[in-house]
Each structure stands twice: as structure tokens, then as C-alpha cells.
């Protein structure tokens, strides 16, 4: 209930929120009834009737003190009450009087007992107990309990940086970040480089500067003691001669104790692998070395099989976050890499670089030496020549010297041939027995040791060898059935999901596999041929 009491006291006015069952007794306690106008009384009684009789949780207490049960507690008149009673009716409401503002706040939170001088401050504070967050961000949907917090959050989306450093003109989105940054200008540069005597305010800046010296030292090989010191500097520790903090050398370098005790282990890490910075983080599984501990940590996921980054759409997991970012573009359809020539977008940068080769001079004109057809790229030309190879009959095997010469693709360098191979091995390598399977411009140099089948790509040979080994690395998450190739798993999962991506343009019927659609389309092609016979009958 709101009560407006006006007077000509020291303050301009006072607005109080009071919970009271009997407003008559409250008016007798706070001020004489003769000093109140009838309109103020009607407002008090009307607002009081709208409140439940026992609603006390989350409401402030009265000025004179009131129990949570709702019954008023009598208090003797004070100087503040006398000042309130002496005010003239109709005075404008304003801030608290000096006697109230200088003292303890009179708006009390019934949940934690904290006091406030303003009703608006109490209302904002009560949101911490109720969990109310009425201010919603229109970009990401995050909600806030206070409007200034929403304004600070929206700067992350807009990129606004309204707080500028007067020393270096660097800008910040929040004032506390600016105040923290300004301390760096008043702080003396106490960290000096022992090689060039350059001073830095932070030890982090000194460590980054010292890495530049390490890269400049051409051909220098650091000893074990220098390697340990460099590792200590990376961990922001100052190291005296000897093992750091009493820890053994192998533990400080992140190595295995068993491997460290082997002969030649110290010599393996005693110096850098190249002219740059030494690599002191070594994988215990394969022996590969890294300059950063984070790189070693990511590399070890290859051996442990850890995939901490999961796709929220399909559940597929990845060992590195950039791989997950690239995968998410398959769901969102984002293509952030556009071609500057034709405007075509690509999800990955490597796909864009491969596409840019088609815009190079002469790349658009790749004629086929057999039929003269122009292909857009050399890869398209090789695929086109395979069609010619399948259409042509197989060349019978003749004398060892009658090897047919393959026509060269324009602009494509010939593959080197080893002079140590025997004629029989060379015939097998170049696919003499399977001339109809290999294109005339691209020999098949990857041969299966089990059945002798040849392939043009190493990946195709790897997939083929799963037939002999029985390996099925792609399991179905629904029924557990395993497959040797991922496309087979994709087709199988359509049986669980009911997806039918191949639609017949004639009748609109859907199919889960493309060959089923092609078989179905024969029905529509054969229907007109049967109609004359039916009419003759």
C-alpha cells in the first residue's frame, strides 16, 4: 500500500510503502488526521483493500516498525514523525530529508534484512531472491535483472568500446577493464631482458620477447640446463640452477620417467630440432616433439581417442574445436569463404583454394585428346577420360615391349617410374591386365597384395582392403550393425529415420536409395509403350 504524506518539513516529500491491516491506527501513529486531506485518506484505504490481508513476504516494513504477522507495533513519536506531521498538504515528493538520508535506510528486505533508502533500490534487490530477469537480449536471448547489465552485455554483439585510455588510445567495453588497464601505465618496467636490456612491465611480455631471441640464434644448441630454464620461464617461474622446486628434470619437462632413464634420452632433448626454439614437450607414444604443452595435449588425443567436442545437432564428436566449427557449417549452411571471381561460397578455406585453380589462365580449357571436349578442370578431364577407357575394349597383352603409350594430359606432369622394377611388376603396376579400368592419362599404381586389384588413389585401396581384413569401423548407433564404408552406414540409417531424399518427379514417390528411384522410373518410361497394345485388344 502506498501512502503519500506531504508537509513543510526539512525535506521536499516522502513516499513510503507500508503493509497495514488497519490504516486508521497507522494514521494515528504517524500523523494527526487533521493534517491529512480527504483525498489522501481515500487513496490509502482504496490501495489497502486491493492487497491480501496476510501478504507480507517480499513487502517492506512500516516506518514505525511492524511484525510480519501484520499487527502494528506501537512506537513513541520521534523527531522524524513530528517533521512529517508538520508538512503542508500538496507538497511535491522528493528525496529523503537529511535526517533520514544520513541515517539507516527505512525500506527493509524481509528475506535478508538489508535496508535501502529508496523503494526502487529495494525493488531491484528483491530480484536476487525471486530470480526475476525482465531484461532480455534480442540477439542471444540471455536475460538480466538490471538494465545496465543488459547494456554492457549488448556491447559484445555491437563491438562498441566507449571507454578510451587517454595514454595509448586503447578502447574497452567496460569501465573496470579501463581502470585495470590504466594501472599498467603507472607501473614501472621492472622486467629487463638480459640480452638486449629492454624493459617490460609484465613478465609475460618479457617471455614473448625472449622467444624472438631464441628464434634468432641460428645453429645454437641449448644444453639440458638451458632447456630446463626455458621450460621454467614458460610457466612464469624464476628458476635457480638445479631442478625447479625440487622436482626431477623428467617431470619438469613433461616426460615419462621410464623413457628418461633409457640411454640417449638426455641427448635427444638436449638441443632444438631446428634453428628456432627448442621443442621440449615429447609424446611418450610416438616420440613426436612439440614447442607448446597445449600442442602436445591436443596431439595425445590421437592415441587416447578422446573427443571432448560434441556436435549439438548430430552428436558427432571431435578432438579439436576448429574441426567442430567446420562441421557445424554443414548443419547451418554457412559458407564464409566466397570466391572473389564468381562469388561461389565454400565452407572450408581449402575448398576455396582448390576452386581458385579453375580461374587460373588456361585452367578453363582442358580439351580431351580423344573427343576434343573441353573440361573445366584437370580433375574433370581425368574423370572424363575414364569414361573413354570403360567404353574402349581391353587391349590384349602382347610382347613386353609393346606397352601402349598413355596419352598425356596437357599441363600435367608425368608420374616418375622406377627403373628398378621388373617388366612383370611394371605391367602389373600400370594395369596391363585391367586396361579397361584405368584411364589412359592416369595409371593405377596402388595394388592390393591379396587379390592384385589396382587403384588410382591410396584411400580407395585402404577401403578395399577392409574386404580382406573384415574391418567395419562405422557402427550404427541405433542397432549396432557395423559397416566398412561410411556411405553404407548413411544409407542404412535411413531405415531407422524413415528419410526418403530421392523423389520421383513424375509421381512424387520417395525412395531411400538412388538405385531404387532409377528402377522405379523405368515404370514411367514403359507405360506409354504398353498403351497401344492395350488399345488393340
UniProtKB/Swiss-Prot annotation:
Keywords for the protein's UniProt record, in alphabetical order: DNA-binding, Isopeptide bond, Metal-binding, Nucleus, Repeat, Transcription, Transcription regulation, Ubl conjugation, Zinc, Zinc-finger
Ranges for region Disordered: 39-98, 386-437
Glycyl lysine isopeptide (Lys-Gly) (interchain with G-Cter in SUMO2) cross-link site: 533
Protein name: Zinc finger protein 775
PANTHER family, per database record: GASTRULA ZINC FINGER PROTEIN XLCGF26.1-LIKE-RELATED, ZINC FINGER AND BTB DOMAIN-CONTAINING
GO molecular function list: DNA-binding transcription factor activity; DNA-binding transcription factor activity, RNA polymerase II-specific; RNA polymerase II cis-regulatory region sequence-specific DNA binding; zinc ion binding
GO cellular component: nucleus
InterPro entries listed in its UniProt record: Znf_C2H2_sf (IPR036236), Znf_C2H2_type (IPR013087)
A Gene Ontology biological process term: regulation of transcription by RNA polymerase II
Zn-finger region bounds: C2H2-type: 107-129, 135-157, 163-185, 191-213, 281-303, 309-331, 337-359, 366-388, 446-468, 474-496, 502-524
Compartments (UniProt record): Nucleus
Similarity annotation: Belongs to the krueppel C2H2-type zinc-finger protein family.
Organism: Homo sapiens
Low complexity bias spans: 82-98, 388-401
Function: May be involved in transcriptional regulation.
